Amino acid sequence: FEKRIELDDKYLFKISQKVKNNSNSSIDLFPYAQMTRNKIPDDIQNFYIQHEGFIGVFDDELKEDDYDDVQEKKIVRESNEGWLGITDKYWMTAFVPETGKNFKSTFLYEDGFKANYIINKPTTITRSSSGINELRLFVAAKEVETIDGYAENQNIKKFDLVIDWGWFYFFTKPLFFVIDYLFKISGNFGTAIVLLTIAIRLIFFPLANFSFRSMAKMKAVQPEMMRLKELHKDDKVKLQQEMM
């Protein structure tokens, strides 16, 4: 049995496990991995816009389970590809099984919170031969650039959903990139927010200007409208005709 662990500069582990069969018969092995959290964090804040607990993507579908849900009953899912793990507000631990291998994941509470998976189809190793299983393990802070980089370079589907962008994902994520770009230019988040506010004001200036013009026109005709109302207060039809 041989285990090889590689670690890049962004804390993605590549774990390769090699088994050599020195017996006279074939053996079946089921690759398996498990992570454990001993207790719920003291400062956990499960707002509806921020999830802390179990998380995973199974066949393109994001699943999020709270610690309370897992304490009540274990949650089992099967998938042909995806990833699974435990997330905090700023940190994340996730398993990424080999792509294309059907696996069963289990979230459960048993002397601690556990997230594990097992490959459903065994790896058959014939006599005098060897077999290899590979696993990726992410243990790091949830930095947008790092997460997006792994999602693309490592072909990890929807790995960017590790970061909870909320219901308005299509808007909040691009907005983050704009603020981040302005921060890199200015070196200060306060300045970046001010610059973003100015930019938004400039973008919507034509619309606001049109609104102000309409209000000014309404103010200009207000005296005449009041005069007509007073003049034709007893004749609604005539008032409507004059106003038109």
Regions found by a protein language model. Name each.
Residues 1-158:
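Soluble non-transmembrane domains of integral membrane proteins
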Residues 25, 187-188, 233-235:
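Surface-exposed helix-capping loop/turn segments at secondary-structure junctions
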Residues 119, 178, 243-244:
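Cytosolic juxtamembrane amphipathic/interface segments immediately preceding
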Residues 128, 182, 201, 225:
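Conserved hydrophobic/aromatic pocket- or pore-lining residues that grip, position, or stack substrates
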